[in-house]
């Protein structure tokens, strides 16, 4: 008995996050992308003889990078505009192999338990499809277009379908070909096509851990599940930043985006916010992304008198693109004058709004230089900043 698997990874759904971070199947889950976990579930099962990975035409490079160590163990083909077309492409790619049975699986389900595969394999026969299902526990409501409840749907005999769904190969191929010839393309899964074609579908108990990553919260759930029973080192990075500016004649200085009345101002190309400059460098350091001068050269006139919050937002966007989460920032201001204490609260509140973290994760403190050096002579202010950012995955071994 030969069993093949088709893994569908051609989707372009954006519900699990912005596509600027890549399709969900290539987002990191632990030390490798979601799709790698999915592939390994089938590779590690001895009964699976062939694996077809169906990807989006634009994803050949990102896929090659993601599955570099696995690509020799499967066949990669180009999918179509819909899930149904992609499945048919995968089935056609197996026509020369002619397996007895074929699994059809969502690439965004990375936790297929070996027990579930075994249960499917002991249940398969040449006449039926096998569908893992979970009972519906929530109360179901039928809602109108105006968001009003029309009726409550009884939960009896209602189930949620999972993948992998397993079918006799020749039957499911014929069903998909017939659906395409009939221009029937409104099916949401393969068991629905099988039902329409007349293939009996037998259900077996699904696995609650076999989640599909659809929404942003699902990625966090998946990461938590992966951590269970595993001793790994999360990818927590720390960056440091330092900046200094001299005084010149003026009426206020800007620190952490807050204007503080003073008989002088800080001299600089931008608004010379020494605190935000140091913090921006600290955040950039967690991505190895250079320093503030790399991104905003002081020789560029467009940054003359610019708000340093622009620089900070830029660093935050770089972190967001890498799916990082700012966990903590610590800023030390070194100055004889002015007194920072009266403004610490409002400075912290401003950083809270910019960084989108709670105030207990923000530390702003000040010290003098004990009358030593240029700071002791009241010629300027220096700032030290440390930032801690958590990124998905773990420290590479």
UniProtKB/Swiss-Prot annotation:
Keyword terms: Isoprene biosynthesis, Lyase, Metal-binding, Multifunctional enzyme, Nucleotidyltransferase, Transferase
HAMAP family: IspD, IspDF, IspF
GO molecular function: 2-C-methyl-D-erythritol 2,4-cyclodiphosphate synthase activity; 2-C-methyl-D-erythritol 4-phosphate cytidylyltransferase activity; metal ion binding
Keyword Lyase: yes
Segments for region (2-C-methyl-D-erythritol 4-phosphate cytidylyltransferase): 1-236
GO terms under biological process: isopentenyl diphosphate biosynthetic process, methylerythritol 4-phosphate pathway; terpenoid biosynthetic process
Protein name from the UniProt record: Bifunctional enzyme IspD/IspF
The protein's annotated pathway: Isoprenoid biosynthesis; isopentenyl diphosphate biosynthesis via DXP pathway; isopentenyl diphosphate from 1-deoxy-D-xylulose 5-phosphate: step 2/6; Isoprenoid biosynthesis; isopentenyl diphosphate biosynthesis via DXP pathway; isopentenyl diphosphate from 1-deoxy-D-xylulose 5-phosphate: step 4/6
Sites where the protein binds 4-CDP-2-C-methyl-D-erythritol 2-phosphate: 243-245, 269-270, 291-293, 367-370, 374, 377
Protein's organism: Bartonella bacilliformis (strain ATCC 35685 / KC583 / Herrer 020/F12,63)
EC assignment: 2.7.7.60, 4.6.1.12
Residues the record marks as site: Transition state stabilizer: 15, 24, 269, 368
Catalytic reaction equation(s): 2-C-methyl-D-erythritol 4-phosphate + CTP + H(+) = 4-CDP-2-C-methyl-D-erythritol + diphosphate; 4-CDP-2-C-methyl-D-erythritol 2-phosphate = 2-C-methyl-D-erythritol 2,4-cyclic diphosphate + CMP
Family annotation (InterPro entries): IspD (IPR001228), IspD/F (IPR026596), IspD/TarI (IPR034683), MECDP_synthase (IPR003526), MECDP_synthase_CS (IPR020555), MECDP_synthase_sf (IPR036571), Nucleotide-diphossugar_trans (IPR029044)
Job description of the protein: Bifunctional enzyme that catalyzes the formation of 4-diphosphocytidyl-2-C-methyl-D-erythritol from CTP and 2-C-methyl-D-erythritol 4-phosphate (MEP) (IspD), and catalyzes the conversion of 4-diphosphocytidyl-2-C-methyl-D-erythritol 2-phosphate (CDP-ME2P) to 2-C-methyl-D-erythritol 2,4-cyclodiphosphate (ME-CPP) with a corresponding release of cytidine 5-monophosphate (CMP) (IspF).
Family to which this protein belongs: In the N-terminal section; belongs to the IspD/TarI cytidylyltransferase family. IspD subfamily. In the C-terminal section; belongs to the IspF family.
UniProt KW Metal-binding keyword: yes
Location of the region described as 2-C-methyl-D-erythritol 2,4-cyclodiphosphate synthase in the Swiss-Prot/TrEMBL record: 237-397
Residues binding a divalent metal cation: 243, 245, 277
Required cofactor names: a divalent metal cation
Positions bearing the site annotation: Positions MEP for the nucleophilic attack: 155, 212
């Amino acid at each position: 008995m030969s069993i093949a698997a088709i893994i569908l990874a051609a989707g372009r759904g954006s519900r699990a996050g912005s596509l600027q971070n890549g399709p969900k199947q290539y987002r990191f889950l632990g030390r490798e992308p979601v799709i790698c976990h999915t592939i390994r579930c089938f590779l590690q099962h001895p009964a699976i003889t062939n694996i077809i990975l169906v990807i989006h035409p634009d994803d050949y490079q990102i896929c090659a990078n993601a599955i570099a160590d696995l690509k020799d163990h499967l066949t990669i083909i180009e999918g179509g505009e819909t899930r149904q077309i992609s499945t048919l492409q995968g089935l056609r790619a197996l026509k020369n192999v002619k397996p007895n049975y074929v699994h059809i699986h969502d690439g965004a389900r990375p936790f297929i338990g070996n027990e579930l595969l075994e249960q499917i394999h002991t249940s398969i026969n040449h006449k039926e499809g096998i569908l893992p299902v979970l009972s519906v526990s929530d109360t179901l409501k039928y809602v109108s277009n105006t968001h009003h409840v029309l009726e409550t749907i009884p939960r009896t005999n209602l189930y949620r379908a999972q993948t992998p769904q397993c079918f006799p190969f020749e039957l499911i191929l014929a069903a998909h070909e017939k659906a395409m010839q009939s221009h029937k393309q409104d099916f949401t899964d393969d068991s629905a096509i099988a039902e329409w074609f007349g293939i009996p579908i037998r259900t077996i108990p699904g696995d609650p851990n076999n989640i599909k990553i659809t929404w942003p919260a699902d990625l966090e759930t998946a990461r938590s599940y992966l951590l269970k029973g595993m001793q790994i080192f999360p990818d927590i990075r720390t960056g440091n930043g330092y900046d200094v500016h001299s005084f010149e004649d003026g009426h206020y200085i800007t620190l952490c985006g807050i204007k503080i009345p003073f008989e002088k101002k800080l001299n600089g190309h931008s608004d010379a916010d020494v605190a935000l400059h140091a913090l921006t460098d600290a955040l950039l350091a967690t991505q190895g992304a250079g320093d503030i001068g790399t991104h905003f050269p002081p020789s560029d006139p467009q940054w003359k008198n610019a708000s340093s919050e622009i620089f900070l937002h830029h660093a935050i966007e770089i972190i967001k693109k890498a799916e990082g989460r700012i966990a903590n920032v610590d800023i030390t201001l070194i100055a004889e004058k002015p007194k920072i204490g009266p403004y610490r609260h409002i400075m912290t509140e401003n950083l809270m709004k910019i960084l989108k973290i709670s105030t207990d994760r923000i530390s702003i403190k000040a010290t003098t230089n004990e009358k030593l050096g240029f700071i002791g002579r009241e010629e300027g202010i220096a700032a030290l900043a440390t930032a801690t950012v958590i990124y998905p995955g773990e420290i590479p071994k």
